[in-house]
């Protein structure tokens, strides 16, 4: 039996120095922090848009409940929540607290006020102007 001994070649292994490793870690961390800030801002905007769509849906749903049941309904906005007695909608963190406001719907589904509902986000103001009688609204958005 022949014993074959293979000699292993030694490859020079070059490793990063501590300074190079720290530099790479710093650059990668800086990039990740920069990207997470823009992702967070985008997430907040999407969350706000979904809130406004849900608010409009809740407003119209309360109208339909009032009309279908021939009952008076109210949509209550208080603090950080909107409720019609059956459903609740919480404010996203980026929206400021809202003063207490109640919108009354009559048995025909219309409201009896010309009130404005104003929501303040970090970078814009969203105003819902309610029309009396028919229960419709006009949404306007202003920066700042």
Q: Whereabouts are the PLM-identified features?
A:
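N-terminal single-pass transmembrane signal-anchor helix
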Residues: 1-39
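Phosphate-interacting basic helix/loop segments used at nucleotide- and nucleic-acid interfaces
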Residues: 54-61
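Residues at secondary-structure transition points
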Residues: 13, 46-53
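N-terminal helix-rich module
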Residues: 2-6, 34, 38-49, 64, ...
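Conserved catalytic core of two-component sensor histidine kinases
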Residues: 25, 49, 56
């Amino acid at each position: 039996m022949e014993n074959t001994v293979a000699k292993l070649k030694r490859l020079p292994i070059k490793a990063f120095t501590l300074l190079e490793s720290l530099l790479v870690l710093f650059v990668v961390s800086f990039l990740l922090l920069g990207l997470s800030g823009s992702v967070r801002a985008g997430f907040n905007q999407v969350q706000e848009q979904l809130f406004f769509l849900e608010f409009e849906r809740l407003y119209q749903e309360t109208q339909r409940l009032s009309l279908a049941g021939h009952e008076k309904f109210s949509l209550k906005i208080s603090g950080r929540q909107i409720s019609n007695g059956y459903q609740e909608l919480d404010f996203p963190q980026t929206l400021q607290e809202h003063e207490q406001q109640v919108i009354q719907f009559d048995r025909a589904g219309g409201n009896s006020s010309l009130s404005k509902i104003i929501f303040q986000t970090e970078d814009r103001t969203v105003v819902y102007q309610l029309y009396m009688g028919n229960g419709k609204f006009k949404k306007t958005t202003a920066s700042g």
